[in-house]
């Protein structure tokens, strides 16, 4: 009897392990007196406390009858005597509830929760909004199910799995420089397997060789002669250029370097980490570095094997070297968050040595991450798009292995990569050697061996290569190629490098497929066949089956050419016996397909290479998990980032224009699409409707701009507008299309003077100036009120982004009825901030297009916004004349009338009455005026505020604040002088113009000759501190003659005189001067970061510090209420 009671009340948890989500009884169990009783218990359930369901029911007032509550006990009392086991106990049978029984425990809200859970798991499901408390509702749902519910267990398991999968196990990203930077030998890419993919580790094997091969394989020389040897050159069917295959050579040598002393060893890393540039191991890396400012030795690269390749391979390496050195210069100048701060001067010798070493190391390693980022983006968006023929489409799709995947069945990333012997063979693309490179290789044999390649034995070849390698200087900066000579600074001449690159762009590569390998490479290919046999790699069919491809059943399937198929049959007897390497070379090549097949490789290679590309990139932690702005810096991440709206993501032009800024036009097809020959590119772009986007002439040297810094020359260029015009070239036609003819009239002095005279007669000067002053004061004060954020008793406002940049926008919108969207005009087209960005982009494109790498994207962005803006203005002018169907819409822009709007309407109507057409008014008068005025005024305002809040100018702030509270003509004059002095002392910009004349000038005691067509840049920074013109040049003085100031950006702008800008800036300074205790915001937000640029001007950092702007974009200040 005691045993029966013991088995009756024993806890289930004592019998077996608890399942997820299954609750055990809360009653105390009778001690188990027999360990053998674990599986033999009474059917009577143990007494337990009420479940959550019972609690819920009781709270609802649903009382449970005693008969229901103790039904199991009553049932047991009527049960027959247990006799199912030898010791008189019942066999235990686990009973679970059905779906219908579970559903009875759930409410309507629970079913809604289930629906949301299912929706979140569907493909394309949105991220979970945790404000809906979905996770907590899941907990509620599961807790309401019975303890013996199978669905409770399944839901609990799913919940646990999701929580587990939310975090990586083990973590793949760690803190510290050991993991933040790439190691020299590629180790630590996967921290849990630190030697995976490192240099000097063994090759992996991709497929097991299971097929029993014949005892005697064909002679390698015979294989070459019958399957490999090129009889005639076959140009690539898609006209892919040699540059594509040179880039492929970089990739191949980046991840494969067989140790010929131990061919199972790979001496380089298994990652695309540019070890060809930086070195395979630390000792090699030390030889390429200067150990100063993070730089590499000029025009040098580590990999000596590339010296034996066609010279353009080396040119590409030099370009990457130059980009690295450019990148570290920018990193040091920006110094994001103090990451690259130079050591203090007061350190001890030992401390200083360590600090400078760390400074160099941080710059070098971050520069490497950035340069690798450019390298991989070119590989994915220029090189890979060419492989699959996406360059012949306008599609922005790309097979980017770094894609962020959502869901439970996603491809892992950052796990590492180990190169295999099979892919070492798969990447030998000698068939694609161009006719030019074939001839070059023959000449190399003659020069090194003294006889034709056909007469060079294998022994002689190996000895000759060994001798060549031994004679190469160990110091990369001492090496050269293509008989080029280094200059005094260690660099090669740009002209020599560009000629090699351009020739390669125009050089069509060879075709894949059987009998396309140059005979000059016979010994090289024999070595490859022999090595593949020593590696015991699987057969061609085994390789195909590994990738899910149908194995070849006949030789004709391998290659439909009867002669090639017969040669294969004679050599191998059966398709299963065809070796991997000879097989992938002798296979039939795919025919081009748009998109799909670009480089037309052989069939097996086409599939395998894409898998390897994904493995190489997705397996690399530095291209996936740790590829982010924090590691590359905001500037570095942005600089190498692709833009799908530009060339569908292709970015080779960034490398070309940074390396050779004076050779490639910003829109040169040679820079944008170098992996297909230009003549074929022209056909492609014509079909795509993009032919006009590019220039097609062969790159030529463009003299660098003439930089002038003296006051006399600055004044000359600023005032002689007929001799120095805006350097916009063909830009106006590209941006404004058919309206460009009218826009150019803005530079016609006769046209401007004629209509300025008309305007002066139409305007009441005194009344106009009063209206401008009142408007600017009111709008500035209103923006200060609306945009100020108050927290912790402090008022803070972005005085640049929310006040200085918007005030002239609102002014222009009122005068010219710009389609501005605001609270007052909700039917507008552009918001105030958008309008400023539009006008700033157009100004930059038309008047300050200096950075060639940024020029092409800038032109396309300007084209996208410029023409629509001009058309909107023209429609508005027509509306004022009452002749436009859109007059009702554009009248809404003027619903909120004020004096300035009335002036604008009046002037427009008068111009129409004076015989000017709406098209001419909009494109030759209004649009050029707005583009020139708005950004320039905004820039000047920020320069003024920045100066008087700086250490140098803050002593004048009390006087400005005193004058701001006065409303007299004298206070206006004094405030204007404060404005002009601040601009003089704080203007780091300049003028960029094109000369229309021949002129000889003296600048800083140097004779400079300027020719027609020369680009000229004058910097204001030095000119404005010329002591001969400005006595006490560093001081603010209010008595300087007005005509001594050089500030052409402040006007005149069309019919708006320079006085208009002067009044505007004075009014804005007055409004700001009325703020109490005005000061800069603490920290970086209160710093107007300027980066010095070549030529004596400074660029501003954008708010995210990711790129430069000629206009300030953000500057926060604080003031008291």
Swiss-Prot record:
Region annotation (Disordered) ranges: 1-66
Domain of life the protein comes from: Eukaryota
UniProt KW keywords: Calcium, Dioxygenase, Fatty acid biosynthesis, Fatty acid metabolism, Hydrogen peroxide, Iron, Lipid biosynthesis, Lipid metabolism, Metal-binding, Oxidoreductase, Peroxidase, Prostaglandin biosynthesis, Prostaglandin metabolism
Top EC class for this record: oxidoreductase
Active site, per annotation: 253 (proton acceptor)
Disulfide bridge map: none
Pfam family, one: An_peroxidase
Entry similarity comment: Belongs to the peroxidase family.
Protein name per the record: Linoleate 10R-lipoxygenase
Naturally occurring in which organism (per UniProt): Aspergillus fumigatus (strain ATCC MYA-4609 / CBS 101355 / FGSC A1100 / Af293) (Neosartorya fumigata)
């Amino acid at each position: 009897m005691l045993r029966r009671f013991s088995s009756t009340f024993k806890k289930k948890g004592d019998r077996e392990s608890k399942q997820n989500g299954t609750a055990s009884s809360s009653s105390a169990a009778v001690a188990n007196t027999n360990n053998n009783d674990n599986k033999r218990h009474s059917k009577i359930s143990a007494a337990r406390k009420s479940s959550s369901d019972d609690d819920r029911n009781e709270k609802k007032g649903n009382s449970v009858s005693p008969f229901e509550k103790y039904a199991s006990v009553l049932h047991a009392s009527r049960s027959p005597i247990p006799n199912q086991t030898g010791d008189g106990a019942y066999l235990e049978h686990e009973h679970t509830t059905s779906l219908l029984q579970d559903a009875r425990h759930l409410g309507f809200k629970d079913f809604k929760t289930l629906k949301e859970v299912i929706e979140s798991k569907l493909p394309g499901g949105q991220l979970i909004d945790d404000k809906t408390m979905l996770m907590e509702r899941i907990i509620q749902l599961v807790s309401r199910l019975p303890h013996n519910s199978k669905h409770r267990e399944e839901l609990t398991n799913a919940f646990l799995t999701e929580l587990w999968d939310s975090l990586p196990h083990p973590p793949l990203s760690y803190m510290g420089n050991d993991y933040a930077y790439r190691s020299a030998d590629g180790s630590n890419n996967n921290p849990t397997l630190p030697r995976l993919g490192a240099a000097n580790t063994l090759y992996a094997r991709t497929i097991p060789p299971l097929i029993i091969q014949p005892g005697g394989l064909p002679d390698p020389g015979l294989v070459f002669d019958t399957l490999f040897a090129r009889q005639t050159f076959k140009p690539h069917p898609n006209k892919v250029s040699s540059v594509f295959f040179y880039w492929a050579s970089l990739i191949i040598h980046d991840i494969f370097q067989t140790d010929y002393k131990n061919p199972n060893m790979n001496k380089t890393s298994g990652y695309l980490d540019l070890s060809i540039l930086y070195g395979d191991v630390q000792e090699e890396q030390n030889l390429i570095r200067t150990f100063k400012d993070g730089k590499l030795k000029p025009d040098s690269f580590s990999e000596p094997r590339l010296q034996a390749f066609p010279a353009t391979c080396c040119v590409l390496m030099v370009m990457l070297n130059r980009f690295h050195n450019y990148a570290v210069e920018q990193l040091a100048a920006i110094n994001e968050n103090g990451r690259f701060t130079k050591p203090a001067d007061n350190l001890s010798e030992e401390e200083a040595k360590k600090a400078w070493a760390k400074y160099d190391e941080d710059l070098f390693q971050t520069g490497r991450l950035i340069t690798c980022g450019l390298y991989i983006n070119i590989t994915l968006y220029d090189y890979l798009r060419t492989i699959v023929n996406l360059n012949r489409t306008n599609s922005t799709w790309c097979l980017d292995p770094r894609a962020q995947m959502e869901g439970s069945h996603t491809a892992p990333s950052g796990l590492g990569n180990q190169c295999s012997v099979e892919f070492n063979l798969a990447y030998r693309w000698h068939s694609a050697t161009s006719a030019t490179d074939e001839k070059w290789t023959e000449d190399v044999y003659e020069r090194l061996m003294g006889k034709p390649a056909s007469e060079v034995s294998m022994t002689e070849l190996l000895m000759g290569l060994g001798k060549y390698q031994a004679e190469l200087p160990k110091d990369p900066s001492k090496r050269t190629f293509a008989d080029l000579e280094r200059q005094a600074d260690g660099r090669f001449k740009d002209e020599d490098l560009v000629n090699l690159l351009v020739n390669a762009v125009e050089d069509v590569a060879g075709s894949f497929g059987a009998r396309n390998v140059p005979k000059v490479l016979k010994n090289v290919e024999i070595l490859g066949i022999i090595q593949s046999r020593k590696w015991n790699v699987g057969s061609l069919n085994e390789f195909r089956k590994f990738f899910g491809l149908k194995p070849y059943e006949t030789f004709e399937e391998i290659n439909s050419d009867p002669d090639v198929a017969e040669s294969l049959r004679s050599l191998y007897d059966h398709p299963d016996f065809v070796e991997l390497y000879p097989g992938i070379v002798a296979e039939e090549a795919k025919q081009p397909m748009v998109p799909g097949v670009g480089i037309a490789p052989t069939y097996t290679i086409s599939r395998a290479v894409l898998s390897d590309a994904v493995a190489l990139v997705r397996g690399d932690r530095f291209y996936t998990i740790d590829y982010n702005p924090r590691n590359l810096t905001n500037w570095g991440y942005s600089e190498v980032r692709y833009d799908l709206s530009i060339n569908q993501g292709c970015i080779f032009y960034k490398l070309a224009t940074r390396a050779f800024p004076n050779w490639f036009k910003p829109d040169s097809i040679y820079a944008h699409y170098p992996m297909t020959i230009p003549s074929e590119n022209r056909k492609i772009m014509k079909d795509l409707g993009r032919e006009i986007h590019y220039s097609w002439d062969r790159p030529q040297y463009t003299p660098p701009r003439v930089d002038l810094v003296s006051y006399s020359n600055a004044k000359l260029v600023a005032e002689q507008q007929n001799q120095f015009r805006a350097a916009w070239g063909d830009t106006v036609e590209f941006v404004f299309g058919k309206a460009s003819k009218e826009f150019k009239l803005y530079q016609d002095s006769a046209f401007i003077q004629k209509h300025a005279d008309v305007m002066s007669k139409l305007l009441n000067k005194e009344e106009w100036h009063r209206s401008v002053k009142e408007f600017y004061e009111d709008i500035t004060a209103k923006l200060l009120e609306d945009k100020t954020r108050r927290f912790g008793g402090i008022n803070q406002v972005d005085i640049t982004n929310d006040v200085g940049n918007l005030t002239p926008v609102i002014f222009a919108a009122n005068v010219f009825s710009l389609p501005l969207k605001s609270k007052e005009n909700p039917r507008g087209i552009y918001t105030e901030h958008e309008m400023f960005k539009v006008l700033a982009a157009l100004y930059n494109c038309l008047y300050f297009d200096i950075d060639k790498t940024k020029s092409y994207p800038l032109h396309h962005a300007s084209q996208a916004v410029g023409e629509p803006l001009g058309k909107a203005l023209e429609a508005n002018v027509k509306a004022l004349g009452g002749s436009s169907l859109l007059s009702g819409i554009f009248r809404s822009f003027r619903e909120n009338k004020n004096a300035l709007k009335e002036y604008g309407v009046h002037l427009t109507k008068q111009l129409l009455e004076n015989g000017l057409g709406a098209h001419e008014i909009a494109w030759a008068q209004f649009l050029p005026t707005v583009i020139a005025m708005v950004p320039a005024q905004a820039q000047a305002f920020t320069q003024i505020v920045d100066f008087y809040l700086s250490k140098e100018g803050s002593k004048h702030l009390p006087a400005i604040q005193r004058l701001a509270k006065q409303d007299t003509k004298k206070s206006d004059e004094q405030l204007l002088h404060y404005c002009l002095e601040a601009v003089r002392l704080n203007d780091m910009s300049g003028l960029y113009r094109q000369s229309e004349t021949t002129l000889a000038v003296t600048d800083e005691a140097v004779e400079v000759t300027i020719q027609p067509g020369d680009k000229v840049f004058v910097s204001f920074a030095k000119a404005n501190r010329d002591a001969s013109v400005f006595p006490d040049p560093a001081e603010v003085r209010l008595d300087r003659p007005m005509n001594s100031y050089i500030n052409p950006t402040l006007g005149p702008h069309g019919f708006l005189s320079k006085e208009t800008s002067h009044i505007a800036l004075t009014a804005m300074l007055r409004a700001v001067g009325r703020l109490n205790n005005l000061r800069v915001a603490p920290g970086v937000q209160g710093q107007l970061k300027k980066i010095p640029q070549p030529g004596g001007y400074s660029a501003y950092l954008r708010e995210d510090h990711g790129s430069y702007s000629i206009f300030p974009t953000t500057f926060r200040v604080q003031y008291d209420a």
